[in-house]
């Protein structure tokens, strides 16, 4: 219920991932084909350190950040560990909003908003797109912080006060 939200903080995201309307049939086809493929067997890591090393390599993360993600994201399994997330989350979605639809939803955010984004930007959220989206908010402050998609974990001493100060203003 939007009327119950006093303030909104968006960290490294603002709105949905979008796709051009004219590519809807192609995206739908890809999603159906992916859903029809047999599921791969779970990858078993012999140790947490093996999973941490992979997360560091694939996502360009520091060891402490990768460790946090891995410790939260694996389950013990037979002689090792497996990712606890649903494999279907890695498959393409059949439908995405178009950019105009996403912008309309962003324009509907009525409360004061603080947007905290990483520099450099992620490939799926280029700088021009994210800056344009911020301009669609009714009341927004933008903060760019050196880091990656997990900047809140990489630099909590910077992100924490940015969030706390913004939320405390609502309480006063």
Question: Would you name each region that the model predicts?
Answer:
Residues 16, 122-123, 152-153:
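Nucleotide-sugar-dependent glycosyltransferase donor-binding/catalytic pocket residues
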Residues 4-6, 140:
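Core-facing hydrophobic residues within beta-strands of well-ordered domains
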Residues 147-160:
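Catalytic histidine-centered segment of alpha/beta-hydrolase-like enzymes
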Residues 162-170:
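C-terminal alpha-helix
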Residues 19-24, 127-129, 155-156:
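Short aromatic-enriched loop/helix-cap "lid" or pocket-rim segments at secondary-structure transitions
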Residues 45-121:
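Alpha/beta-hydrolase
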Residues 6-47:
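Flexible "cap/lid" loop of the alpha/beta hydrolase fold
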């Amino acid at each position: 219920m939007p009327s119950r939200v006093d303030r909104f903080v968006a960290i490294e995201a603002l709105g949905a991932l979008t796709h051009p309307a004219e590519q809807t049939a192609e995206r739908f086809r890809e999603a159906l084909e992916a859903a029809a493929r047999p599921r791969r067997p779970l990858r078993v890591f012999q140790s947490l350190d093996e999973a941490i090393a992979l997360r560091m390599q694939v996502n360009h993360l520091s060891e402490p950040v990768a460790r946090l993600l891995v410790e939260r994201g694996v389950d013990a399994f037979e002689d090792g560990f497996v990712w606890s997330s649903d494999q279907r989350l890695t498959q393409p979605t059949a439908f995405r909003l178009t950019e105009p639809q996403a912008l309309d939803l962003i324009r509907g955010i009525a409360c004061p908003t603080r947007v905290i984004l990483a520099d450099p930007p992620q490939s799926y959220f280029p700088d021009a797109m994210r800056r344009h989206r911020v301009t669609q908010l009714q009341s927004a402050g933008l903060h760019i912080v050196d880091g990656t998609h997990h900047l809140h974990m990489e630099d909590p001493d910077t992100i924490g006060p940015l969030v706390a100060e913004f939320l405390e203003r609502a309480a006063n």
